[in-house]
Amino acid sequence: MRVGIGYDVHKLVAERQLVLGGVVIPYEFGLLGHSDADVLIHAIMDALLGAAALGDIGRHFPDNEPRYKGISSMKLLEEVREKLAVKGYSVNNLDAVVVAQAPKLAPYIQAMQQNIARTLQVDLDSVNIKATTTEHLGFAGRGEGIGAYAVCTLQQG
């Protein structure tokens, strides 16, 4: 059994779609980034890569690489799953939390879990996504950005 942890944060800006867990969420701001800036998927990818001792997303998907400009992070997650499979790993369990003051994410959690489970080719009950606020404290509480943490376990075979 291997354990990984991931973290990511992106700035909220106008004129960008907000994408979390592969779900487009109606909101006046979106996350700034080279790809679609899906902070949840980025944290998950870092956890998965770390558990397999494969480095981090910056190593595999550098933000100065033109082919990743605007790419769906779900596509990158699929590539991470393939990298894990090459090393003989599969996802046993994934738990993640999105830290955002707004918007409310509860209505979208199930769709996020379904997208992630489908992409990782695991049962839905192997993926848990939560959302929390910071009670108006820090950058997330001021609405300047959104962060995400993820923990995973991998198994061989």
UniProtKB/Swiss-Prot annotation:
GO terms for biological process: isopentenyl diphosphate biosynthetic process, methylerythritol 4-phosphate pathway; terpenoid biosynthetic process. The record marks 34, 133 as: Transition state stabilizer. It comes from the Bacteria. InterPro entries: MECDP_synthase (IPR003526), MECDP_synthase_CS (IPR020555), MECDP_synthase_sf (IPR036571). GO terms for molecular function: 2-C-methyl-D-erythritol 2,4-cyclodiphosphate synthase activity; metal ion binding. 4-CDP-2-C-methyl-D-erythritol 2-phosphate binds at residues 8-10, 34-35, 56-58, 61-65, 132-135, 139, 142. Its cofactor is a divalent metal cation. Pathway: Isoprenoid biosynthesis; isopentenyl diphosphate biosynthesis via DXP pathway; isopentenyl diphosphate from 1-deoxy-D-xylulose 5-phosphate: step 4/6. Binds 1 divalent metal cation per subunit. Keywords: Isoprene biosynthesis, Lyase, Metal-binding. SUPFAM superfamilies: IpsF-like (SSF69765). A divalent metal cation binds at residues 8, 10, 42. It catalyses: 4-CDP-2-C-methyl-D-erythritol 2-phosphate = 2-C-methyl-D-erythritol 2,4-cyclic diphosphate + CMP. It is an enzyme of class 4 (lyase). Its EC number is 4.6.1.12. Belongs to the IspF family. Involved in the biosynthesis of isopentenyl diphosphate (IPP) and dimethylallyl diphosphate (DMAPP), two major building blocks of isoprenoid compounds. Catalyzes the conversion of 4-diphosphocytidyl-2-C-methyl-D-erythritol 2-phosphate (CDP-ME2P) to 2-C-methyl-D-erythritol 2,4-cyclodiphosphate (ME-CPP) with a corresponding release of cytidine 5-monophosphate (CMP). HAMAP family: IspF. Homotrimer. This is 2-C-methyl-D-erythritol 2,4-cyclodiphosphate synthase. It comes from Desulforamulus reducens (strain ATCC BAA-1160 / DSM 100696 / MI-1). The gene is ispF.
